[in-house]
From Swiss-Prot:
It comes from the Eukaryota. Keywords: Amidation, Neuropeptide, Secreted. It comes from Delia radicum. It is found in: Secreted. Its main location: secreted. This is Sulfakinin.
Length: 14
């Protein structure tokens, strides 16, 4: 998505 977020497993997504 662009912003740093954490998925339901706690992994960083960008």
């Amino acid at each position: 998505g662009g912003e740093e977020q954490f998925d339901d497993y706690g992994h960083m997504r960008f």
